[in-house]
Every structure is written in structure tokens, then in C-alpha cells.
Amino acid sequence: MVFVKNWDDFEIAVENMYLANPQNCRLTMKYAHSKGHILLKMTDNVKCVQYKAENMPDLRKIEKITSNLVGHMASKE
């Protein structure tokens, strides 16, 4: 498991991982109230990337990446 510090790197890694193997990829989100952060984890059963979101602007980024993945799932490519 690799924690990615930069959002842009995480977003690129998630999209590339999904496009390479869409059948085995999954994105999970876990909210830790006591720590005040959201942990995002994308895995394809071979490799795993994680990102820790700790502030409000990151929520918009999470919404954007989720909609991008849903768009890929809905497209016929």
C-alpha cells in the first residue's frame, strides 16, 4: 500500500489503474471522525494507492474523481 501525498498523482494513478483493469478495481472511502480525515483507497488486487483527505476542498476533489470513474463505467469504451 502506497500513500500518495499529492492529489494530482493520486488522481492519475486511480484513473490509470481503472483503465488498465476495470473488472478488478474498487475505490473505498473511510471516514475517521476521531482523526478528522477521509481515507481513499483504490486497489486492483495487485497494487494499492491511498490518499488521506484532511480539509474541505478535498471533498470537491473526491466528488470529481468519483464522477470521472462513474463516467468511465457508463461509457462503452
From Swiss-Prot:
Intrachain disulfide bonds: none
Swiss-Prot/TrEMBL keywords: Cytoplasm, Ribonucleoprotein, RNA-binding, Signal recognition particle
Domain of life: Eukaryota
One biological process term in Gene Ontology: SRP-dependent cotranslational protein targeting to membrane
Keyword hit for Cytoplasm: yes
Subcellular location: Cytoplasm
A GO cellular component annotation in the UniProt record: signal recognition particle, endoplasmic reticulum targeting
Function: Component of the signal recognition particle (SRP) complex, a ribonucleoprotein complex that mediates the cotranslational targeting of secretory and membrane proteins to the endoplasmic reticulum (ER). SRP9 together with Srp14 and the Alu portion of the SRP RNA, constitutes the elongation arrest domain of SRP. The complex of Srp9 and Srp14 is required for SRP RNA binding.
Family: Belongs to the SRP9 family.
Cited PANTHER family: SIGNAL RECOGNITION PARTICLE 9 KDA PROTEIN
Name the record gives this protein: Signal recognition particle 9 kDa protein
Lineage: Eukaryota, Metazoa, Ecdysozoa, Arthropoda, Hexapoda
Chain's gene name: Srp9
